[in-house]
Amino acid sequence: MKILFVSSEIFPFAKSGGLGDVASSLPKALKNYSDITSIMPLYKSIDREKHNIQSTGLVYEFWVNLIQYQFEVFQSGDVLFLDEKSGLFQRDEMYGEYGDNDIRFGVFCYGVLEYIRATEQYFDILHINDWQSALIALLVKEKYKLDSKVVFTIHNLAYQGIFSKKSIERLDLSWDYFTASKIEYHDQINLLKSAIVYSDVFTTVSPTYAKEIQTHQFGCDLEQIIQDNEYKLKGILNGVDYEEFNPSLDANLNKHFDADNLGNKRAIKEDLLNELHLEGVDKPLFVFIGRFTGQKGIDQILESLNTLASSPINIVILGSGEKRYNDWFHALIGLHKNLSITIGYDEALARRIYASSDFLYMPSQYEPCGLNQMIAMKYGAMPIVRPVGGLKDSVADFDGEFSDNKGRGITLENGNAQTFINATYKALHLYLDKSKFNEIIQYNMNVDFSWDEKSKEYLSLFTDLKEGWLPERTIKKFEIPSYYNINTLKTMPVDPNTLYTYWEITTRLLNTHQLSVNQLILKAYVDGIEVDSANIYDRVGNYYFYPEMDFKKVSTKIGFIGAYGTFISILESNVFVAPNAKVIKSDNIIWRNIETDTLNTKRASFMSDTYYEVSDSLSSASILKRKELQKIIKDNQRFGSSKGGI
């Protein structure tokens, strides 16, 4: 199987974030099972001599919007580099706020496909990543008509490649593509959206993030198009390259250790404390390594530091980012004897910090995958995380249920400073129980987050696509036939983390409040607290939310934002109490409430031959087959209540 892996950055040649790490490690792991080549732009910042990058001698030309471009192909090992001769990639920064970024990366996408044409190669799989290479999916399907299957990976949905609609002509595209179902986005073009639409399969970097991006909270205004294409979405947790990140091998350390011999970890910690002018090797060391942005939970850390500075702990912070955060951290330097702050990034220092640390702070507001928590666990540190995205998929609270594919850490239920402080005190208390703490540390060091395992999920997907399998668009099982003569809002659980809601709204109700449909907002509530919301564009429709609702009261409301910015409800759903997640015994049991009013309106067409869990006021939950449910409907029997559920 031949694979072409396309990325705008690949470590160690160029890296701005996690994409660079994945673009290095994943092809390396897949090399054991396939013929894979990686390809990226040849930036000005890349040291050609250091990395032994040599010209292949291949030069080719092509036209885009009546402009001729000339590319030369360079190579280092299994990585190809495309050099555009007019200087599109000879800028001081890889990305930057350049006014022609649409041209820079759009032409790069053309250049990749023209390379395939010039060399007359066939690739079974084209694996493209993030918005910079996203246009390849459209070009493959609409212009080049290649038989290769296209897999698109979203590493961070927040970066979408949004440009003026003038880019349609600048990139030599047809205006036929400028529709809401293709690449149009608020009268602009959205390159990331184009790959969601045109790829054969699109993936994200963790299973939880794949669910989150279908919600208003995490969907970055693309949740609807993602929901529409959910049938071809797969979440695969990133892995770690243990040849690169391993305390028993790391060349950045002057001493080494592993799970069976932790002695040198203390010695490395003592050296680091001396280097950073901190005292107390027996105190727990809490660290943060990363970008200073709101997404990373920096506000939560900053608001907590003055309180934590009086605690018997040491704190080390390494990173840089937004100017306001850089300034705030700079003002804290030297104020507390147990706090060390280094603004900037030094990979060797980062490795020494990982190896010295006892706890890693990672209070991200959202985190598509995250690698730091996996690296930290390998280096004998316990992560303190928000349970979002890949953090939720890789870290479980040590006080919670055991999971053999997750490390053990401490989870933060929200983003306020007191929660962060309490978690730190909880960690301190655990640290004092040396036996228990060391048991957790050794367990974490042995959890396998390697790419050797994770790459097999990609390999399986690629193999299926090569052999002709394609995901099929299906009508969601629980969609209900539409009627326009009533006002109704139904809510029911599909599984412990999936909430289905269906609505019908009459023109009369809209006229009563002098509203149009596009002013309406759907909100989901768990135990009376709003957990998610979405804009509504149809009088009849349905929507899926993904809250945690085990044993909690769940409902939805439809309304609008009033003159003073408050939400005004015009339609409220039934309220149900979600069952215990543990009732699920197999995939053949659907975790779902059949609500009274739904039965009374005799909308049974969405029921299949699977089982449903139903409860009445006289007995505990019972399993009923479809025929029995149909009999209940026919006999107009009632069970439950209009405000209750299972």
Ranges and model annotations:
Residues 32-35, 457-460, 464-523, 527-646:
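Serine/threonine-biased, Pro/acidic-interspersed low-complexity stretches characteristic
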Residues 1-471:
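Catalytic cores of nucleotide-sugar-dependent glycosyltransferases that transfer UDP/GDP/TDP-activated
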